[in-house]
From Swiss-Prot:
This is Small ribosomal subunit protein uS11. Part of the 30S ribosomal subunit. Interacts with proteins S7 and S18. Binds to IF-3. Keywords: Ribonucleoprotein, Ribosomal protein, RNA-binding, rRNA-binding. InterPro entries: Ribosomal_uS11 (IPR001971), Ribosomal_uS11_bac-type (IPR019981), Ribosomal_uS11_sf (IPR036967). One of its GO terms (molecular function) is rRNA binding. Belongs to the universal ribosomal protein uS11 family. Located on the platform of the 30S subunit, it bridges several disparate RNA helices of the 16S rRNA. Forms part of the Shine-Dalgarno cleft in the 70S ribosome. PANTHER family: 40S RIBOSOMAL PROTEIN S14/30S RIBOSOMAL PROTEIN S11. It comes from the Bacteria.
């Protein structure tokens, strides 16, 4: 007999939305203030395949899907947004979170920049 584990639904009013936008995909994670993950989605998980995952529309749909799910399940009202990565869908994902009737307290860019670290890969020759 198999055992089914269900996550307890808990009321989380304040949370953090992490948006990681790369050149190929976008990953949106919604956590509570302690860092416990409530939902994690990507553009590929929302049905986008190939080069369509890197579009601003895919970022908008992924962010709105994640936030709407958390609002329905946990009753979230206030979020702070942390964005990282150089991807194309950064601004559209932020706008999608703001459009979900949430109180956005802060927007922070947490992209890591090297202080002249490793040598970059060479230019592609086709």
């Amino acid at each position: 007999m198999s055992v089914v584990y269900k996550k307890k639904k808990r009321n989380v009013v304040v949370g953090v939305v992490y948006i990681h936008a790369t050149y190929n995909n976008i990953i949106v994670t919604v956590t509570d203030q302690q860092g416990h993950s409530l939902i994690c989605t990507s553009a590929g998980a929302c049905g986008f395949k190939g080069s369509k995952k890197a579009t601003p529309y895919a970022a908008q749909e992924t962010a709105s899907h994640a936030v709407k799910t958390v609002v329905e399940q946990n009753g979230m009202k206030t979020v702070s947004i942390k964005v990282s990565g150089p991807g194309a869908g950064r601004e559209s994902a932020i706008r999608a979170v703001q459009a979900c009737n949430l109180n956005v307290t802060s927007i922070k860019d947490t992209t890591k920049l090297p202080h002249n670290g490793c040598k970059l890969p060479g230019r592609r020759r086709v």
